[in-house]
């Protein structure tokens, strides 16, 4: 893990921040950059989002993370995290200063919801969004698969051949 040592709660969309992110991306040369969504609830997260987009430029595609409770977020990629949900919850609980129990419950609700969007009523999924920007139009080979889709069939009521009187 790399820490840039910017103050918590005071991060801004500054040129200095974007420059430091760019330096790290040039050094690490990632295949994919996963960052907070531009509409995330937390100001620091929005600053990371803006900085990541500038820093990634033509170096790596950016995959936006579903913000808490998915407000105004239209995902186009889903990843089955069912085998890792317990680990995710343990990681969230490590953030003791943030009142983590609330965030664990929110993670469960959101994970079930995103899994259900894939037709899986059991399990957990995380949702992401990639906005294709040249030269990174297709990133499917860079991410794990979504939960398997379960087809749903809805039967319409049978229509009566003879018209009903009015």
Predicted regions and their residues:
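Active-site beta-strand->loop->alpha-helix modules in alpha/beta enzyme cores, enriched
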Residues: 1-58, 69, 123, 145, ...
